[in-house]
Amino acid sequence: MKVLFVNGSPRKKWTTAKLLESAAQGAIDADATVKLVHLYDEPFRGCVSCFACKLKNATTNGLCAYKDALTPLLEKARDADAFAIGAPIYFGRASAVTLAFMERLLFPLITYDQRSTRRRAKSRSAGFRFTRKRPRPR
């Protein structure tokens, strides 16, 4: 089993990363092949609204058509049996880099045609971990 862990925090040693590392260790203990990726290491942008993934005869196979440093990671997510995304919460939402990743990961799978759906070759499990700073009880 291949499991991809995606860290959407700029900090590689803080809470979000530690949660993902702990989950990754559990996957390793269950004999999974694990890959942990830090989104802030990748120079990429969110969806550029080119709509190439929406063309009737698109050959993108559920992947974003825009090519940049994120393309190999999107391919890893497509090929994984399961993946988990971890992100800190900033201004009530996941970090901007996490949202940009999710746009590029999920938008190609959405269809505007009610008669058909876009599907990946296989279904997979996904998990999300969000962290935020909050005061400790006194």
Task: Name each model feature, range by range.
Residues 96-97, 110-138:
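Short, glycine-/small-residue-rich phosphate/pyrophosphate-handling segment
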Residues 1-114:
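N-terminal beta1-alpha1-beta2 submodule of the flavodoxin-like/Rossmannoid cofactor-binding fold
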